[in-house]
């Protein structure tokens, strides 16, 4: 959309998109919060707190009454339903931005299958993937190498646990 609006390619504009699992129903989220916290309102929310590492990810809620609640990912019925596509919007399954061929310069997202292909790169907080789609994206990546710890991976390896790339 931005590229079409600008109607020209700017050298200093890097277009980045994210690997998206989909968007859950806001109604399901509201019902979940009401079920969890009743009349207490959530004033702050962190969906993926990795402070204790990738194997102990929590959803962190701060409520208006000052209490803080940590819910482990594996124990969250909301997260399990989202991961299993129980309430991802139907339009997400028809999204024209899914797939490998993207109009961005780079795509970034979680590298869930890293352990299977590049176990030497594992760390306790998780690893992101960068998929390069353009010469500009390649140039940016090369200019950033001194700030990155990286390995070369095949797009197919990244796509295994990122179904929206398929």
Regions found by a protein language model. Name each.
Residues 18-21, 50:
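An acidic- and aromatic-residue-enriched active-site/binding cleft used to recognize and process polar
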Residues 5-18:
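A short alpha->loop->secondary-structure connector
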């Amino acid at each position: 959309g931005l590229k079409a609006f600008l109607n020209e390619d700017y050298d200093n504009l890097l277009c980045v998109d994210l690997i998206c699992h989909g968007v859950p129903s806001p109604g399901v989220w509201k019902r979940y919060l009401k079920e969890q916290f009743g009349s207490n309102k959530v004033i702050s929310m962190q969906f993926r707190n990795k402070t204790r590492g990738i194997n102990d990810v929590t959803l962190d809620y701060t409520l208006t009454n000052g209490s803080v609640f940590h819910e482990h990912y594996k124990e969250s019925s909301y997260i399990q339903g989202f991961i299993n596509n129980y309430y991802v919007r139907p339009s997400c399954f028809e999204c024209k931005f899914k797939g490998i061929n993207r109009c961005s310069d780079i795509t970034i997202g979680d590298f869930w299958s890293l352990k299977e292909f590049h176990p030497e790169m594992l760390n306790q907080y998780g690893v992101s993937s960068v998929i390069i789609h353009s010469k500009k994206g390649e140039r940016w990546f090369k200019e950033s190498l001194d700030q990155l710890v990286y390995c070369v991976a095949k797009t197919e390896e990244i796509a295994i646990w990122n179904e929206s790339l398929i």
